[in-house]
Design a protein with these regions (language model features):
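Vicinal oxygen chelate
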Residues: 2-3, 91-130
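Core segments of cupin and vicinal oxygen chelate
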Residues: 13-57
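Short, conserved charged micro-motifs
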Residues: 19, 85-90
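Acetyl-CoA-dependent GNAT
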Residues: 60-65, 128-130
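Short glycine-enriched loop/turn motifs at secondary-structure junctions
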Residues: 3-6, 71-75, 107-108
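Helix-adjacent hinge/juxtasegments
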Residues: 59, 68-72, 76, 81
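Short aromatic/hydrophobic contact patches that present stacked aromatics
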Residues: 9-11, 43, 77-79, 113-115
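N-terminal beta-strand motif that seeds the catalytic metal site of vicinal oxygen chelate
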Residues: 1-18, 78
Length: 130
C-alpha cells in the first residue's frame, strides 16, 4: 500500500524561463504562486486543496549561454488530466497557436490523448476519460 498522497512538484530546467512560463499560464491556465524571485525558480500552481500542499510545476532557469542539454534527459513527458469539454477546446486552441498536436493512446486507461511540446521541448500529454 502506498504512503504517498500526491505528486506535488515537477521541476523543469529552462533556457527561456519567460517563454516557458507564458506557455503554461496561457495554454493550461496555471497560476503563478508567490513573488518573483529574480533570478530564480518560478512556481506555477497546477491544482490543490487548501488543506494540502498544492501541485506545482517549478521552472528553474539555466545559466545564460547553457545551450542545448548535453546529457540524456530523464523526463519523458508530463501529463494533465482535463474534462472532455476542456479537451476539445484545448485541442482547438493548441492548433490555432500553430503548435504541432500529436495523437496517442493510453495503454491502460480508456481515454482521449494528445501530445504537444512546450518551448523547452518537453512533451506535455493532455488526457481525458473516453
Amino acid at each position: 500500500m502506498t504512503i504517498v498522497q500526491s505528486i506535488v512538484e515537477i521541476v523543469l530546467n529552462c533556457r527561456d524561463q519567460a517563454a516557458t512560463r507564458t506557455f503554461y499560464e496561457e495554454v493550461f491556465g496555471l497560476e503563478f504562486m508567490g513573488k518573483p524571485m529574480e533570478p530564480g525558480p518560478v512556481f506555477l500552481k497546477v491544482a490543490g486543496q487548501p488543506e494540502r500542499v498544492p501541485q506545482m510545476i517549478v521552472l528553474v532557469p539555466l545559466p545564460p549561454g547553457s545551450g542545448e542539454f548535453t546529457s540524456p534527459r530523464s523526463l519523458h513527458h508530463l501529463a494533465f488530466e482535463v474534462t472532455p469539454d476542456t479537451y476539445d477546446q484545448l485541442e482547438r486552441d493548441l492548433r490555432e497557436r500553430g503548435l504541432e498536436v500529436r495523437g496517442g493512446t493510453h495503454p491502460l486507461v480508456p481515454s482521449r490523448t494528445l501530445y504537444v511540446d512546450d518551448p523547452e521541448g518537453n512533451e506535455v500529454e493532455v488526457i481525458c476519460r473516453a
